[in-house]
């Protein structure tokens, strides 16, 4: 069942009913100011950090869902009132449409012949949202309405805002000047920032105190001021500051009225905080408001935003026979990669924006799907991540985006973390050819007195694994590896503690991870190549010895007969083995080890992937492990705390499905690779949205597995490494156009029935227009490549860096 449709020409998903299976959201903002907005205008905005600089308030896990946002109430002459976004009033509308575009959302609602259309977006180089409201009278009689705007301010620190009521009920402060409401809570003391909400029209009243506007016992659906048709002109003093403009408007027959609201954020230099004692300096806010006085100003900024996305998405465009594949690669997958890079895992409708910041493992993987768009941002992120490493090569698990300082709020000691830095750095160098990044001086633990080159950071990442091997010579798992919930040293009996942050019960010198072994080989090969290209042959040989040894160790101690083991627990017992009662086979080592090339030559790789298909496959994707754990295993940790079929306990953890798709291309099975890719890709799931529930235009982290009552239901959409890895899988391994240190490799591995495809790729200062033909209907293999009319040797397209377009013909066979 569908609840909308793709508008590929305008690069929008169009939702035609407010009653979707779950709120379907979008993200606004490209730099420092970001917003989450649902198809009903719910959500919130923040500056840089969703925890420390939350601007508007939102209530998670609320009834009804999606409570709090940017609301407009239209009150008609007969007392009927409604919201064009349907929420929060939920009055029936004769027309509803929400268009989620790239960095903007347009919502239209109509009732009684009056249509209201609101375009929400964050302009480029702007710290605020624009709300462009157009009221159209579609009748032949004049319409007199009372319009109320509404947003509720958060008192900056989102955690404190929802917990420290004894203080917060007494701190709220505002200023009102003309048609602008300023939120200045705590500005009198340590803060130098404020927010504001403005409208480009004279107002007939206002409210800034929530209780005065709402009434103590009313909800968003029926504020007392709207019910009665009169604002209170309230000035907040403590309690809950809001911003509500009241306008009395007349719209002529078949005429329209246009209004521009700005929800903005301003920081003032300490010496310029005040206009005069007690009155904030509004200079910057007035400049922001002045920028959007007319509809033409709005359209110009929206056009600039769309052109920005034109340029970014134009760096990779594909043309295949499959329109769903085209729209995912050309539009939505790249868009999601940008969002995950900007937001990491911090703020969504499943992440509160409070506990999680920029994850080390997460963000290094996000770079893989983002680096082609804005490589300079990827470069800075790599350096920021390296700066939270410790001198032994280990690292904090995350940093707070506002401070860029590492913290252990969601735990530490995840022994896979350091290796991801090698993969992101190598991806950056392959994309850009910029080897100078390795010479950048980066501190350890943000300590300027402890600096080393980025290359030295990579070296310590590599040797952290070498120096932390267990009894079998496999890497020690620490608190966990990529699977945060496989806690082999935790042994938690206390329900009041977190698996991720509690002190491990054991010293961690026994439990080993086969997954990290595969990751070490994959990243280690890159480290060896980097050393060689830097002329460090001795370093390269030494590192290569460790990589070869790990391959041998994995084949000897990490192979279970039909698939790769998952781990050894704290007692040296196998995890993910046919010997286990439950949890006999796990997906992660099968994908990672084969991606790393382990077992390809001796047939183990094919056996492992065949076992994945036999034991882990479902109509909705590959489950993480089987059989699901039916009880709590204290020696395994959080993974066994979930009911069967959910999350890590045999849910379809979409993030690792692309690893298996890539692994299938390693052994040349294009049909199977594309089948795995397609099963979790949202555009292919649009027709079953009532089952899938989350947005049909972005990937979700998790889909309920076959052991779950709600098999096929997705959760945790948007902020997931699935986005980056799916983009890597389809563009670099299935379509097979991937950056190398020397140029663009063309090595497709596609379904045999494909006739071919086209891909345009901007790479290192040139544009490659690549046409792949598959007349013999093979899955893998390149017979010849012709560049600009000349046949080349091998499969790597040269680096031109000449600003020109180069035409490439690839013949498979």
Curated annotation (Swiss-Prot):
The record's CDD domains line, in alphabetical order, gives: GH94N_CBP_like
Q: Which SMART domains does this one have? A: CBM_X
Which residues, by range, are in coiled-coil regions? Answer: none
Asked if Transmembrane is a keyword of the record, the answer is: no
The protein's UniProt keywords, in alphabetical order, are:
Carbohydrate metabolism, Cellulose degradation, Glycosyltransferase, Polysaccharide degradation, Transferase
Temperature-dependent activity: Optimum temperature is 85 degrees Celsius.
How does activity shift as pH rises or falls? Optimum pH is 4.5 to 6.0.
InterPro entries the UniProt entry points to: 6-hairpin_glycosidase_sf, 6hp_glycosidase-like_sf, Carb-bd_put_dom, Gal_mutarotase_sf_dom, GH36_catalytic, GH94_Enzymes, GH94N_CBP, Glyco_hydro_65_C
The protein's Enzyme Commission number: 2.4.1.20
GO-annotated biological processes:
cellulose catabolic process
Catalytic activity of the protein: D-cellobiose + phosphate = alpha-D-glucose 1-phosphate + D-glucose
**Which pathway does UniProt place it in?**
Glycan metabolism; cellulose degradation; Glycan metabolism; beta-D-glucan degradation
| GO molecular function, a single term | cellobiose phosphorylase activity
Q: Which family does it belong to?
A: Belongs to the glycosyl hydrolase 94 family.
Sum up the protein's function in the record's words. Answer: Catalyzes the phosphorolysis of cellobiose, yielding glucose 1-phosphate and glucose. Is inactive against cellotriose and the disaccharides lactose, chitobiose and xylobiose. May be the primary enzyme for processing cellobiose in T.neapolitana.
Q: What is this protein called?
A: Cellobiose phosphorylase
Natural source organism: Thermotoga neapolitana (strain ATCC 49049 / DSM 4359 / NBRC 107923 / NS-E)
Name of encoding gene: cbpA
